[in-house]
Every structure is written in structure tokens, then in C-alpha cells.
Design a protein with these regions (language model features):
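Glycine- and acidic-residue-biased ligand/ion/polar-headgroup-sensing regions
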Residues: 56-58, 62-68
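Ligand-binding loop in jelly-roll beta-barrel domains
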Residues: 32, 89-115
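Conserved short histidine dyad/triad with adjacent acidic residue
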Residues: 39-54
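Short strand-coil-strand connectors
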Residues: 71-75, 98
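Short acidic-glycine-tyrosine-enriched beta hairpin
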Residues: 74-89
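A cytosolic small-molecule/anion-sensing beta-strand core signal
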Residues: 64-65, 80-81, 99
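A short, N-terminal "cap"/entry segment at the start of jelly-roll beta-barrel domains
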Residues: 1-35, 120-137
Length: 137
């Protein structure tokens, strides 16, 4: 079966840390597929993920609008529209917006654990429109 979703019809998740929101297009809840997690993300100017890594998970960002920096142990690199960022499993990283940022995110498999190295547990909490909280694993 094929799944077709429109972003305006899907639930938006808003980070408990201001400036970040996401919409999942592929998740276990939407498709009964747990092999990957995919969706779009929007960051306000200056918003950032915590410095973190994912155990057992490859991570991709495709930047569609805006400018950002990607921080890894190798340094900080500026990225913008058309750039694809690949983060291997267990690679430490942080994405920080320079301008309002819009990007597509893909993680596989969706059976992973996130470890925060610089940030707080609140960085993994996302509020759903129904008031429930989704905790990023």
C-alpha cells in the first residue's frame, strides 16, 4: 500500500525548547513502518538542536530554505539550500540555524537512542497539538 500525506493534514510537533517544530511523514504511528523516520523541520533564527548522537541510526538533513551550521567533532560547517548532510550512527552533531531554516530530515532505522552531550532532557520533548508529549528516543 502507498501512503500519501499532506503536511497541512498531519500533526505538528513543537519543541518544548522554543524555536523548533517538526511534522513527520513517515513514522510508526502513521504507517506501521518502524524502519525509518522522515519529516520536515523548521527552526527559527538562532534555534539549535542539542549537541548529541544517535546510537544505531543514520541521520540525514536536506536543507531546503535558510542557512545553518552543522557542528561535528571535525568542526563547524555552514550549509544552505541544496545541501545534504549525512551523519553516520554515533557521530556527534548539532544543527544551528543562522536564518529561519526549513529542511527535510530522515533517520534510519527508527529504533535508536539519542544521547545528549550538551543540552537538557527538555531538548528531546516535543508537544503534540492534543497536549500529549512525544519523547524523542
Amino acid at each position: 500500500v502507498a501512503y500519501i500525506f499532506n503536511e497541512n493534514e498531519l500533526p505538528k510537533l513543537v519543541s518544548t525548547v522554543p524555536g523548533r517544530e517538526r511534522i513527520f511523514f513517515v513514522s510508526k504511528e502513521l504507517t506501521d513502518v518502524n524502519d525509518m523516520l522522515a519529516g520536515i523541520m523548521r527552526y527559527a533564527k538562532g534555534a539549535a538542536s542539542p549537541y548529541h548522537y544517535h546510537k544505531n541510526c543514520e541521520h540525514f538533513y536536506f536543507i531546503m530554505e535558510g542557512q545553518a551550521t552543522v557542528e561535528t567533532p571535525e568542526g563547524v560547517t555552514e550549509v544552505g539550500p541544496g545541501d545534504m548532510v549525512f551523519i553516520p550512527a554515533e557521530e556527534r552533531h548539532r544543527l544551528r540555524s543562522i536564518t529561519p531554516l526549513f529542511y527535510f530530515e530522515f533517520q534510519a532505522p527508527n529504533r535508536f537512542q539519542t544521547t545528549i552531550l550538551d543540552g537538557t532532557p527538555a531538548d528531546l520533548l516535543w508537544e503534540k497539538v492534543d497536549g500529549k508529549v512525544w519523547v524523542q528516543s
